[in-house]
Regions:
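C-terminal and late-domain segments of enzyme folds
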Residues: 1-36, 45, 49-56, 60-64, ...
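A general structural motif
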Residues: 8, 36-39, 92, 125
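General beta-strand structural signal in soluble alpha/beta enzymes
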Residues: 13, 70-72, 96-97, 128-131, ...
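Short, flexible loop segments at the rims of nucleotide/cofactor-binding pockets, characterized by
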Residues: 16-20, 71-76, 104-108, 164-166
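A conditional alpha-helix N-cap/helix-loop micro-motif detector
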Residues: 20-23, 78, 85, 111
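Portal/gating segments that form or line small-molecule/metal binding sites
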Residues: 40, 46-100, 104
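Class I SAM-dependent methyltransferase SAM-binding "motif I" and its flanking Rossmann-like core
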Residues: 98, 104-172
Length: 238
């Protein structure tokens, strides 16, 4: 059964392709839900791929939506233990975890002061968005991008694994993730420009231009289009 521990904020897990036109309506809605105009962007997953450019792209994107971006200068574990940066996250109303390497992102965030602050902000009502690598990491189990098997994620959402870029992924990786899916877990394959949204009410929805493909060992595969609700409170496998 899908669980989100003590959730009181809004959670958006994106299948990739952040800050592009298909997400305009969703990102505008998330900004409004936050109750402010500031977005705290964490580029740590792109530490080896010009994280400064990630923040620049986000700044340009949210400016067009009436928002302003503050980049959180975190690229390694030492940064993630800084009290001043953790406080910025704890006080934020909208936190956006950018795409990149989920394994590097895990090494930065797992057990860190920064991750504790992010969770506290979310539990306090903040909007938390995570794209690609971030979406994968916030779940547990977590799809390992090196071969499609599973490893340990951060577990903000338990019992659910997210497979980003599902429609573009190599078939053998998708098939391996389905084959190795734990009996008590749900795999959500998210297409690019597609998001799994959990509202403060606890309801899950699929948003965006693509499809969410839902896999379980004990149920037929199903597809949910953007704009449709999604019941993730499925019974555990017997």
């Amino acid at each position: 059964m899908a669980t989100a521990k003590k959730p009181t904020g809004t959670l958006a897990l994106l299948g990739g392709g952040e800050w592009q036109d298909p997400y305009r309506e969703l990102d505008g809605a998330l900004l409004a839900m936050s109750g402010g105009d500031e977005v705290l962007v964490l580029p740590a997953a792109a530490a080896f791929e010009h994280p400064g450019r990630v923040v620049e792209r986000a700044t340009e994107w949210f400016a067009g939506l009436g928002g302003k971006v503050v980049g959180l200068d975190v690229v390694n574990r030492r940064d993630a233990e800084r009290d001043d940066l953790a406080k910025r996250a704890r006080d934020a109303r909208f936190i956006y975890i950018a795409d990149g390497s989920p394994l590097h992102l895990r090494s930065v965030l797992k057990g860190s002061a920064l991750y504790a602050a992010i969770v506290k902000a979310y539990h306090g009502g903040a909007v938390l968005a995570a794209s690609g690598a971030g979406a994968t990491l916030l779940c547990d189990p977590m799809v390992d991008p090196r071969g499609g098997a599973y490893t340990v994620g951060l577990g903000l959402v338990g019992g659910v694994a997210v497979f980003p870029y599902h429609g573009k992924a190599a078939a053998h990786l998708r098939e391996r993730s389905v084959e190795l899916l734990p009996a008590d877990a749900t795999l959500v394959g998210l297409d690019e420009h597609t998001a799994l949204l959990r509202l403060e009410s606890g309801e899950w929805h699929v948003e965006g231009s693509g499809t969410a493909t839902i896999y379980r060992k004990d149920a037929p595969t199903r597809e949910v289009e953007g704009g449709e609700p999604l019941d993730l409170a499925v019974p555990a496998a017997t």
